[in-house]
C-alpha cells in the first residue's frame, strides 16, 4: 500500500457506524495487552459506541478526520477545541483526543499524516499549541509523539474501569 492512495478527509455522519467498528478494533489492538479484560470491555462499552460517537460528532468544537483506503476507514483522529476538550480547556489550544491507525497499517506514515493534519488545523485556527494525553505505558505512542516534536508537560488521571491510570500530557507549541 502506498500512502498516496489513502484519502484523508472529514468523517461524514453516515460513516459513524464504520468509524466506530474501526475505532473499536484499533482500541483493542492498542490496549488489550497490559490491561484487565473487564476494564477494556467497560471502557469500550462506554466510549466506543455509535451513540457516544454521534454525541461527540455533534458536539461544538469536535471534528473527526479519517484515513480511507479502498472505501475502508483504516485510521482516524478526533480533535477538540473548547468546550469539547477533555482537560486543559484553553481556548488557545487544540486537543488531539484520539489518533488511531489499524495494526496492519502501522509504520506507513498514516499516524504522522493524521498528526500533521491536526497540527495544521491548530495553526489555521490560530492556536498557540496542540496537546494530547497518552497512557504512560504506551511506549510506542510516546516515542511517536516525541519524534514528531511533542514534549511531556504534565500528567492527569484517566479512569479506566475499576482503576485509575496515568496519562502523560504532551504538547507542541507553535
Predicted features and spans:
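Conserved phosphate-binding and hydrolysis motifs of nucleotide-dependent enzymes
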Residues: 71, 75, 109-111, 149
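Active-site acidic-Proline motif in GNAT/NAT acetyltransferases
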Residues: 102-104, 108, 136-137
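Conserved acetyl-CoA-binding loop-helix of GNAT-fold acetyltransferases
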Residues: 107-120, 143-147
Amino acid at each position: 500500500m502506498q500512502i498516496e492512495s489513502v484519502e484523508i478527509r472529514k468523517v461524514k455522519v453516515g460513516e459513524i457506524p464504520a468509524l466506530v467498528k474501526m475505532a473499536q478494533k484499533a482500541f483493542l489492538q492498542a490496549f488489550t495487552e497490559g490491561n484487565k479484560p473487564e476494564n477494556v470491555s467497560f471502557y469500550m462499552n462506554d466510549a466506543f459506541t455509535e451513540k457516544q460517537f454521534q454525541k461527540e460528532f455533534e458536539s461544538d468544537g469536535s471534528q473527526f478526520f479519517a484515513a480511507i483506503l479502498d472505501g475502508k476507514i483504516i485510521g482516524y483522529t478526533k480533535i477538540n477545541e473548547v468546550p469539547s476538550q477533555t482537560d486543559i480547556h484553553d481556548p488557545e489550544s487544540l486537543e488531539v483526543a484520539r489518533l488511531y491507525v489499524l495494526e496492519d497499517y502501522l509504520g506507513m506514515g498514516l499516524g504522522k499524516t493524521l498528526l500533521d493534519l491536526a497540527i495544521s488545523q491548530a495553526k489555521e485556527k490560530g492556536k498557540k499549541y496542540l496537546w494530547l494525553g497518552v497512557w504512560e505505558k504506551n511506549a510506542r505512542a510516546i516515542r511517536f509523539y516525541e519524534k514528531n516534536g511533542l514534549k511531556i508537560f504534565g500528567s492527569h488521571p484517566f479512569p479506566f474501569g475499576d482503576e485509575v491510570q496515568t496519562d502523560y500530557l504532551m504538547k507542541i507549541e507553535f
